[in-house]
Structure formats: C-alpha cells, structure tokens
Amino acid sequence: MKVTRKRAQRERRHRRVRRKIFGTPERPRLSVYRSNVHTYAQLIDDIAGHTLAAADSREVGEAESRVEAARKVGELIASRAREAGIERAVFDRGGYKYHGRVAALAEGARAGGLKF
C-alpha cells in the first residue's frame, strides 16, 4: 500500500509540474524517468507529440554508481541534442526531487552543452 501511495504522490507532483512546462521544437522538454536500476531521458516536442532524442543508462556501459550513470546519460542526451540541432531545453524532473540521479543527469546535460 505504501509503494502505491508513494507512486501516486510522484505522479501528482509530475502533473502539477507539467501544467507549467511545455516543450516546443525549438526548446523541447527534457523529461527524466527513474527506475530502481536505470535512468532514462527524452527530449520531447509536446506540440507534435514526438520524441526528438532519447538516452538511458543501459547505453552508457559500466558506471561506478547509478548517480554516475545518470551523469553519463545527461552527457549522452546533450550530444544527441546537438546532433539534432537543439541547444536549449526545458527541464522536466518528472515529479522527482532535484537530487541524486536527477540532479546528476541535469549537470551532465549542462556539461554536454545543453542549456536550461
């Protein structure tokens, strides 16, 4: 029961944040999803409803920790964004706290050249 409530609270926070955040083709939404093991990131154009670029921790290979893997995912999504001609994005933390893996992904994306 507790897990269900925790997930519902995260989804509620995500809906609240999503009311304010919207991605466009010029400035897509950088959406973050965190599972127990992996971290996923997508650049989404909400107008067309398309994913412009995606990356996840399964692609980055071995990492010392999940936080380090998330940082590498951020760098990978930033490089894919540059390839797609995207320089700026809107960060969507997905209802998660801006801490740990979510913050590491954001820092990695910024280090890779993505601005938000």
Swiss-Prot record:
What CDD domains does its record include? Ribosomal_L18_L5e
One Gene Ontology MF term: structural constituent of ribosome
Pfam family for this entry, one: Ribosomal_L18p
Q: Which UniProt keywords apply?
A: Ribonucleoprotein, Ribosomal protein, RNA-binding, rRNA-binding
User: Which Gene Ontology CC terms are recorded?
Assistant: cytosolic large ribosomal subunit
UniProt subunit comment: Part of the 50S ribosomal subunit; part of the 5S rRNA/L5/L18/L25 subcomplex. Contacts the 5S and 23S rRNAs.
- Identification of the protein by name: Large ribosomal subunit protein uL18
